[in-house]
Amino acid sequence: MISFSSFYKQISDSSLQHWLETLPAILGEWQREHKHGSLPKWEKVLNKLHYPQPDTIDFTTSVTIGSGEQLSAGEREKLENLLAIFKPWRKGPYSIHGVEIDTEWRSDWKWERIAPHISPLANRTVLDVGCGSGYHMWRMLGEGAKHVVGIDPSPMFMCQFEAVKRIAGNEHPVHFLPLGIEELPPLDAFDTVFSMGVLYHRRSPIDHLIQLRDQLRTGGELVLETLVIDGDENTVLVPEDRYGKMNNVWFLPSVKALMLWLKKSDFIDIRCVDVDVTSLAEQRSTHWMPNESLVDYLDPNDVSLTVEGYPAPKRATIIATKNQPNKETK
């Protein structure tokens, strides 16, 4: 069974220590609920990932663990076969002892767009909401973050993260918790909170913004990336049914509308730092994610539209600061 004891130990003397009043019970219940299904099989695979301390680690320009020279060809093939059990790999890429995990998303491209605009992460306590397999968490660590906590309710994403961490070394202060943000108490403790690719999946986007705000210390920074459409502060797309074949997309605001939502949620210093149309090179099917991808979600005769006729995915990154005092948004 995946253990969270090292996380409890790391936060016991940190700004997150009051979380220990509730977190062990929540995660204990999660473990009891997931004794069956795919998780036990994945945990057996994790227990086979015994490799030497990597001779090189790079989290600053990539997520590279090991040069590939420490393993024989046979050992590298075995590692690749074990990691393949966790398909589909959606966020990456990773290079692990010479095994190149070419994920569906070029998440490094997103990081390169965002990183120049955020406050330096050195010595900061960071929360990544909807962290997926944890690619960006490793890049946050590479920027010098003191603690990085990622939350995502997916057991598969947790096991993908655990696979990478066990090979990299468990001593790194980066942790995955299989939780949704609605399961977090208002911690008021993180220096930086990231929410990337989550807001449009929330039925109540304002509630999500308030949940993000409540995790930040006063003066802390929110980095919000989400799907947007063109328009003024009153423009919001509500898909009638599906958007890009996804049935869990609820609200796509314009940048101006999104900034207004943030202001109403008691954020200040709100600024849009990037708007980018998702390209077919950034999101595509690969050997490590062989299912449908962006090209299958777009109109084959007009890639500026989804198959449903909506504007094709365009993503904006907004940075904002938690205001003082923390008043409840009505």
UniProtKB/Swiss-Prot annotation:
Pfam families from the UniProt entry: Methyltransf_9
Any one GO biological process: tRNA wobble uridine modification
Molecular function terms, GO-annotated: methyltransferase activity; transferase activity, transferring alkyl or aryl (other than methyl) groups
Source species, domain of life: Bacteria
UniProt-listed InterPro entries: CmoB, Mo5U34_MeTrfas-like, SAM-dependent_MTases_sf
This protein's record includes keyword tRNA processing: yes
Enzyme class: transferase
Binding site for carboxy-S-adenosyl-L-methionine: 91, 105, 110, 130, 152-154, 181-182, 196, 200, 315
E.C. number: 2.5.1.-
Gene3D superfamilies: Vaccinia Virus protein VP39 (3.40.50.150)
HAMAP family associated with the record: tRNA_carboxymethyltr_CmoB
Subunit structure: Homotetramer.
Protein name listed in UniProt: tRNA U34 carboxymethyltransferase
Organism of this sequence: Shewanella piezotolerans (strain WP3 / JCM 13877)
